[in-house]
Amino acid sequence: MLTLDTLNVMLAVSEEGMIEEMILALLSSPVLAVIFEKSPRLKKAITNDLPRWREALRTRLKDVHVPPELTEEVMCYQQSQLLSTPQFIVQLPQILALLYRLHSPYADQAQQLVDGNSRFTPALHTLFLQRWRLSLVVQATTFNQQLLEEEREQLLSEVQERMTLSGQLEPVLVDNDNAAGHLWDMSAGQLKRGDYQLIVKYGDFLAQQPELRQLAEQLGRSREAKSVPRKDAPMEAFRTLVREPATVPEQVEGLHQSDDILRLLPPELATLGISELEYEFYRRLVEKQLLTYRLQGEAWREKITERPVTHQDFEEQPRGPFIVCVDTSGSMGGFNEQCAKAFCLALMRIALADNRRCFIMLFSTEIVSYELSCPQGIEQAIRFLSQRFRGGTDLASCFRTIIERMQGREWFDADAVVISDFIAQRLPDDVVNKVKTLQKEHQHRFHAVAMSAHGKPGIMRIFDHIWRFDTGMRSRLLRRWRR
């Protein structure tokens, strides 16, 4: 079967001009003109996409097969070119019959040329073939234009859908022209309106929490700061975590003698019910010799001191990917869940604007991951936002997964962000040591986004920076009042 590309080569038909005309007609359509006027960023993104459109149209024209009737007529024309005038005169009745059988537009004109001349001279032979070729060129051009018109309608429909999607998500995810280009590339997937409305919903929630969005921007841009000490620098408050004596109970460490009634062993408490041993119980209570559970922990408090400001100058530094770990335990449900998802959406916005990768991991009893900056980033974001936080907390597995991922070359300068209320078990020593190694030798930065004021300081002390966003009712009311 003859392909359209072969036919164009045989008849010297140039499809490039037709492709350019089709693209110009598409871009000048009234629908796109209105959208371009409203959103210049989308116009720039589509302009950058034009080379891909041209290549797709060329591929489409190459793969199409020519109708059998046109193929047969072209083959007959090719054979007729090889005949001499006497041979052509002999084959002329069969050629005319073929043209009429194929319903060729040239059939009537060919018959008129034969009937209008008593002698079939070599000049008439040449004229016959020239007009026949011209008819074939017109048929091939018409066929090309029909295909391009179908492609134009399909492409226009696709562009309108993608522009509608991009227009809806632009306020949520677009911060500059770079992000607009990424969003346009992501919009190529098969998405329905009800799907991406979930992103719009959390975008609206983020707009109602300006402090949360500001926190995400500070975290995302935190690598810009370069410390430059100056003699005349003003003083600033410097916060450090100071270790206190082990007065905060975290876990059972064993048994010891004390007067702690709340942590008595059951056998000691049973002596109160025996009259002969009651005085003995009180004696041991006074002397702090009762057997009780020993609960120990590591208590840390925040110490505020004054020091000269060291962050005076700002110099752009390389920014690596985000590896964001989100706690999906039951305590992170409700408002905490909304804040965590909206925060990840804000980090996705920063990643698109700065050409950074954004990798989300949900940690509970198992690890589920999504990459929001990949070509299918919108679909991945929708799947992430559709998750429900109802599991347990396995912070150690989360850190092990982060450590394993940071071993790869493409993540050598990644920033890890852990979003949790940090109400969990203490991290194993081997995990803590590996994190410290990554921080010291590879300059990886670990950020904690604390959604509660009751997180365990013993867990959070391994982070380079702690970003606090208390979701308690009191803090929420205070933030609302300050607005």
Curated annotation (Swiss-Prot):
User: In the UniProt record, does the keyword Ion transport occur?
Assistant: no
| Organism of provenance | Escherichia fergusonii (strain ATCC 35469 / DSM 13698 / CCUG 18766 / IAM 14443 / JCM 21226 / LMG 7866 / NBRC 102419 / NCTC 12128 / CDC 0568-73)
The reply on keyword Cytoplasm is yes
Q: Which Gene3D superfamilies match?
A: von Willebrand factor, type A domain (3.40.50.410)
Per the record, its GO cellular-component terms are: cytosol
What protein is this chain from?
Regulatory protein ViaA
Keywords assigned: Chaperone, Cytoplasm
Function in brief: Component of the RavA-ViaA chaperone complex, which may act on the membrane to optimize the function of some of the respiratory chains. ViaA stimulates the ATPase activity of RavA.
Q: Where in the cell is it found?
A: Cytoplasm
Pfam families annotated for this entry? Answer: VWA_CoxE
SMART domains named among the record's database cross-references: VWA
What is its quaternary makeup?
Answer: Homodimer. Interacts with RavA.
Q: What is its main location?
A: cytoplasm
Q: Which family does it belong to?
A: Belongs to the ViaA family.
